[in-house]
Amino acid sequence: MRTYDLSPFWRSTIGFDRLLNLVNDTVDNGDTYPPYDIERTSEDQYRISLALVGFTPDDVAITAERSTLTVEGRKTDEDERDYLYRGISVRPFRRVFNLADYVQVKDATFEDGLLKIALTREMPEALKPRQIAIDVAGNDHQRSDRTQAA
């Protein structure tokens, strides 16, 4: 049994605290199918990559609802093949990711057996930090005196 310490990532990622907790819980539960990566591509851009070899885009459904992203896959065997050995797993799966506040799904691409889901964090203007100008108290009174004289 492997133990992973993900605490260093908690300090360096913004907006994915709950998602990292989910990753930590997944490692503890032992459910690792399908394997996936979570990466930060820029300040407010993230990407989840799932290894889905053997699946096609038609076999996969992505649902985003509020702060939850669900990826489900079910391979439909259209042709009956006589496998001597079947090492490529195409079992049904369901992955649920809890997204942080203001994280939205931007798009999804499927290429070379990898499903890549782009996420972006769009903070509302009212919640972004802003610079506040500091006026000198004496200058404020002089300005009002000039206004009255004019």
From Swiss-Prot:
Location of the sHSP domain: 27-137
Residue spans crossing the bilayer: none
Domain of life: Bacteria
InterPro entries xref list: A-crystallin/Hsp20_dom, ACD_IbpA/B, HSP20-like_chaperone
Keywords, sorted A to Z: Stress response
Family per similarity comment: Belongs to the small heat shock protein (HSP20) family.
PANTHER family: PTHR47062, SMALL HEAT SHOCK PROTEIN IBPA (PTHR47062:SF1)
Name of the protein this chain belongs to: Small heat shock protein HspE
Source organism per UniProt: Bradyrhizobium diazoefficiens (strain JCM 10833 / BCRC 13528 / IAM 13628 / NBRC 14792 / USDA 110)
